[in-house]
Amino acid sequence: KIQSGNDLTSGTGTYTVTFTNPFYSDNYAVGISAQGLATGDYYSLGSKTINGFNIAFKNSGGSGVSRTFDYLAKGY
């Protein structure tokens, strides 16, 4: 099963991606393509469940920043 999202805006906090159709297991792969990152920006994924996952973008100082991203999730 593959699920994806395009041009999502994270906001400055934690963004929750919710799948339309849950996976059977939380052992799926997630690929992220971030747009408009500044030097030193990074993201972290967390709370992967069968229903979705969380993502947060931060700048080099560790403060939350709003960024646009695409994702692709593949699993069972």
Locate predicted features.
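Extracellular attachment/recognition segments
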Residues: 1-76
